[in-house]
Amino acid sequence: MQNGTFAARYDDVISDPKMRALYGDSGYFNVGYWSAATKDLVSACDALVDQVAAPISAGARVVLDVGCGLGAGTRRLAARFPRARVVGANLSLWQLRMTRGRGARAVATDAARLGVASNSADAVVALESALHFDTRDDFFREAFRVLRPGGVLSTADMLFRDADVIGPWMVPAPNRIADLREYEEHVRAAGFTSVASRDVTPVTWTPYIDAMSSVFEDQNVVRAIASSVSHYLLLTAVRP
């Protein structure tokens, strides 16, 4: 699928009334990280950004948020790293406008061909976006290229048993892996070391499905979407 076509279709997904009922004007579009203290989906989304940000050094100077969505996550990263240049990246011009409208920096670029200088970033973040990249492996290689030695890749990602359930256009065929260890091997193949992942499905995907069920009338659809995911993971890796 052409990048412009994908971006337009994904904009429509984000703008869907059911999704707006879930997220409102929060600027988020992720499943969140839930705990006993979580008040609502928006606070869960804040917590997920914090989880992805946790491995990044407080002294980071440049942080790239690749696939930045509507910008709430980029803005939160900028608040966490006030001395860093935090930049969102996206293909969608509408999403870029929304991100900039929230006071965050953002640039138009393809995750598989980042328009960023080599050895220029301290951290690359992909929060629920790498599954869509064409391809995820190309993104891993690009993240390796743009990171400085010692830089960190931090992702929140989903692996699917059946990606067609959410729409065959949303997950390119090369990204359709279901095994967590295989995902790690793809990261290592790009050159990364200190690769560490953890399955956090019970505190991300599972409670999100509960929230989703409140706005979807067809619970069969919700159950199919719920069972399509094999792992919701958090991963960190280091560019040697």
Where are the regions a protein language model picked out?
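N-terminal auxiliary segments of SAM/dcSAM-dependent transferases
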Residues: 1-22
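Conserved alpha-helix/loop element of class I SAM-dependent methyltransferases that forms part
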Residues: 42-59
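Class I SAM-dependent methyltransferase SAM/SAH-binding core
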Residues: 64-113
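A short acidic, Gly/Pro-enriched loop at the edge of an enzyme's catalytic core
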Residues: 112-124
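A short glycine-rich, Lys/Arg-flanked "PGG" loop and its adjoining helix->strand segment in the class I
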Residues: 137-152
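Short, glycine-/aromatic-enriched active-site segment of Class I SAM-dependent methyltransferases
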Residues: 158-174
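Short alpha-helix
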Residues: 175-191
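Conserved catalytic loop of SAM-dependent methyltransferase domains
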Residues: 196-217
